[in-house]
Amino acid sequence: GYDIRRDADRIKRRVGYMTQRFSLYQDLSVRENLEFVARLYGVRDPRGAARDMIKRLGLTGREEQLAGELSGGWKQRLALGACTLPNPQLLLLDEPTAGVDPKARREFWNEIHALAAEGLTVLVSTHYMDEAERCHEIAYIAYGHLLAHGTVDDVIAKSALTTYTVTGDDLNALAIELTGKPGVDMVAPFGTSLHVSGRDKSALEAAIAPYRDRQGLHWQHSEPSLEDVFIELMSRAKDNFQ
């Protein structure tokens, strides 16, 4: 390991960091940005390294395009190329796909998985649960406190949530009636359905019993999703900024 005070410079050379906001030079081309980063880190043959990265990330044909003229998805791809150009051992990504379209998000994550398969350790912050599910391990942090960690399956299992999915008529009124009842820890709309969850199964079932036979409603026991767990954990988190 490295001492963060004594070995700060050595650590920096082994860590790649991609900011949420695009931070490369808007008035330089794709190639110029990558060559600049390569020279900054002392990479041998900066031109060759930039050329290889352009090919890897599918940026061929855009080499001379100004970075500021790229779409959000292409900018993120360029930023990923820049922070992995020096071959770091650890890659830090701060909400890397915020504001990026679904297709670009999927392509970006495919590249992240390819890098991880090559041995790169990647630490990602994200508020998209579908992205969290792509990770080997996850951690929930709220207001500076670690609420849960482990694999996705571990985190869901440890939550001990019992969840019902409700479909039918006037779900908004049902949500208002159930919110705050003893045993009901979470009520959240999901598309055309409602998720009702609680950690105490007996208390939850007692709370929803009067509504189970209500005309126009269909109740089904379901496995809690990662988003169910996230919402429930956040509802219990103490806001220490208030």
Language model regions located:
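Conserved ABC ATPase signature
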Residues: 27, 66-70
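Conserved ABC ATPase "signature" region
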Residues: 35, 39-62
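Hydrophobic anchor residue at the start of the ABC signature
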Residues: 80-81
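Conserved catalytic motifs of ABC-family nucleotide-binding domains
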Residues: 87
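Catalytic Walker B motif of ABC-type/P-loop ATPase nucleotide-binding domains
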Residues: 91-94
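ABC transporter nucleotide-binding domain
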Residues: 108-199
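C-terminal coupling/interaction segments
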Residues: 197-242
